[in-house]
Amino acid sequence: MSFASETKKELTNLEMKECCEKAELSALLRMNGSLSFSNRRLSIDIQTENAAIARRIYTLLKKGYDVTVELLVRKKMRLKKNNVYIVRLVEKSREILADLHIVRDDFSFIRNISQELIEKKCCKRSYLRGAFLAGGSVNNPETSSYHLEIFSLYKEHNDAICELMNGFDLNSKTLERRKGYITYLKEAEKITEFLNIIGAHNALLRFEDIRIVRDMRNSVNRLVNCETANLNKTIGAALRQIENIRYIDETVGLDILPDKLREIAQLRRDYQDVTLKELGEMVSGGKISKSGINHRLRKIDDIAEKLRAGETVAKK
């Protein structure tokens, strides 16, 4: 089961206040419902591939309106061939849609979210929970990027969801897709805040556990890469220094070098694996700092380059 499916399964087991049930059900019917007329009767089909969500919708309708509700199961014949669950409402459809602020008295659709549904903060959370159950998805935190989104067919409703989310300081953004619109989050901290808002506390803890391990692993990798780069740089510099010292020795001899440079050249040639700090501790006249050793080695490099260019180098 995917992380998103586990999150939704957890949400379908939450207990709610009566006002919150109405807010959640409104989002579920608005986003997953479709209307049909048969034998002069209006019916509502709410479709989902998640059995737990289908049971949730069925229970909320029965509890809230005491109506006859049918639960149908069909199998997709294409792609994954998953089961499709259809919750069918054939009684009081018009009244229920009006009560959930999905249609007006003249049966025109309400595209945004009615303020009467979300007057209380708990109801705001419940509407977002219903919206996530109906059209939401969240990446597994182990994947390369963090992403949570809620899909809506209508721009007005999508903008209303974005505004509702940002009322909780989530910094959500909207984007038009080929068949609708999404409100999305990209920041891990904001995704965990959203999971907390809608009541997915177990999913939140799992998300955070995985994120902490992942971030720690990334930090270790960055540190290792940095140390490896520094080590490669150090090795490269040491090899260059040794090559230059050999070139000077074979071309004009190390005796051409000033005493201080000759001593460092001989030490670097004889102790190729030691660090600059260790070289500084080997100098006969007393300990020299890394920067001091590095300065002398750069002078040796300069002399080697002059010799390669055909210049005459005299001992100073």
From Swiss-Prot:
Q: Which cystines does this chain contain?
A: none
Which InterPro entries does the protein's record reference?
Answer: Homing_endonucl, Sporu_reg_WhiA_N_dom, Sporulation_regulator_WhiA, Sporulation_regulator_WhiA_C, WhiA_LAGLIDADG_dom
Pfam families listed in its UniProt record: HTH_WhiA (PF02650), LAGLIDADG_WhiA (PF14527), WhiA_N (PF10298)
Query: Which residues fall under the DNA-binding region feature?
Result: 275-309
Would you kindly state one Gene Ontology biological process term found in this protein's UniProt entry? regulation of sporulation
Keywords on record: Cell cycle, Cell division, DNA-binding
* MF terms in GO: DNA binding
Name the domain of life.
Bacteria
Q: Does the keyword DNA-binding apply?
A: yes
Q: Which family, according to UniProt?
A: Belongs to the WhiA family.
Q: What does this protein do?
A: Involved in cell division and chromosome segregation.
Name by which UniProt lists this protein: Probable cell division protein WhiA
Q: Which organism is it from?
A: Bacillus anthracis
